Amino acid sequence: MSALGGQARGGDGINWKGTSVGIFILLVAILITYAIEQSMIPQGLFGGLQGVALVFPLIGIIVGGALIGFGVHFVPVGGAPAAMGQAPGIATGVAMLAAGAGLAGLFGGAWAWTATGDFWITILGGGIGGGLMMAITCLMVNLTYVFAMGVPAASGKVNKDPITGYTFPEFKSQGTEGHGLPFISYIGGVMGGFLTALGGTLIYLELLLVYQPGLEQLLGSSAGSVEPLAVSLAGIFAIGFFLVNAVLSAYNITGTIEGPHDPKFKRVPRAIIGCAVASAVCGLVAILIVVAI
């Protein structure tokens, strides 16, 4: 059963009752953040932050979480069966592989922000970092499958590659669900790495833009003195957000997935909603870190 109350055994549909509750929670988180931004909550409870935007960063965090949930479903993951050449995909778990792409993206995005200070270049740089990491990973995986294990790339979900038109049945070994990384899975991996890293970098940058002025007010210090702390906190929370959304997506996938051509890809809307709700709640908590209590 999914986090949104989906059908048992990994059904593809959306449970609208659970989705309605999730959207309500998301809206409540946004309203609370708006109240803090406008200092509408009494000073005895929260002090508020003067002149610091909070609602738009939270919305950015929600969008980033949704991008992570969306991108994870592109990544070809085969788990233990793939390690034995009995299923297509990369021989690891969904969350671990997605987290690797996300960390690569965070490094790329952090470097781009330091070098340029431009918002769009930063999130694009993060996305490119994640996509490049997945491109190299998928290439080395296929080299290992073909030249070390001696198995060609063959999908078990479709009979023909949607991009190249190559057929798979004659290359698929008996008793397996396929093996290797077909071209569509390779492209899916690169797209998934780009989207997940894009979302993770967006979350990092939104948190950083809240923490830098927020810590200045909270600690009464200069911008230069709080910058290392702001960068550290934003990085820690961004990694945490990434893992939360990657694990939620992994539960939604329930096992292995070959990429965008896999029937499990139809579950994407459910993952996007779940990740958006989780990001809203976690984002509210992350923002409260710099609110005077």
Regions found by a protein language model. Give the residues of each.
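C-terminal ends of transmembrane helices
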Residues: G5-G6, I68-A82, T137-V146, V247-H261
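N-terminal signal-anchor module of multipass membrane proteins
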Residues: M1-G79, P263-A292
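Short, non-helical or kinked segments that cap or interrupt transmembrane helices
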Residues: V77-M96, G214, I253-F265, P269
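Membrane-interface helix-loop-helix junctions at boundaries between adjacent transmembrane segments
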Residues: G78-T92, M96-I187
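Membrane-helix interface motif
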Residues: I32-Q43, L103-A112, L198-Q217, V247-I253, ...
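Alpha-helical transmembrane segments
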Residues: L49-P57, I61, F119-C138, S225-F241
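Membrane-water interface at loop-to-transmembrane-helix junctions
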Residues: A8-G22, P162-A197, S221-V231, P263-V277
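Extended, charged low-complexity segments
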Residues: E216-Q217, A223, E227, F242-I293
